[in-house]
Amino acid sequence: LKLKDILGKIKVILSHLNK
């Protein structure tokens, strides 16, 4: 996995947790 892909997944997970 590329760093960009990992960061993208992290952002998605954080966005779901913030809801």
From Swiss-Prot:
Q: Which GO terms describe its cellular component?
A: extracellular region
Please indicate which superkingdom the organism of origin belongs to.
Eukaryota
Gene Ontology biological process terms from the UniProt entry: defense response to bacterium; defense response to fungus; innate immune response; killing of cells of another organism
**Which keywords has UniProt assigned to this entry?**
Antibiotic, Antimicrobial, Fungicide, G-protein coupled receptor impairing toxin, Immunity, Innate immunity, Mast cell degranulation, Secreted, Toxin
Q: Which terms in the Gene Ontology molecular function aspect does this entry carry? A: toxin activity
Residues spanning the membrane: none
Q: Where in the cell is it found?
A: Secreted
In which tissues has expression of this protein been reported?
Expressed by the venom gland.
Its family remark reads: Belongs to the MCD family. Bombolitin subfamily.
Q: What does this protein do?
A: Mast cell degranulating peptide. May also display antibacterial and antifungal activities. Its mast cell degranulation activity may be related to the activation of G-protein coupled receptors in mast cells as well as interaction with other proteins located in cell endosomal membranes in the mast cells.
Name of this chain's protein: Bombolitin-7
Could you tell me which species this protein originates from? Bombus lapidarius (Red-tailed bumblebee)
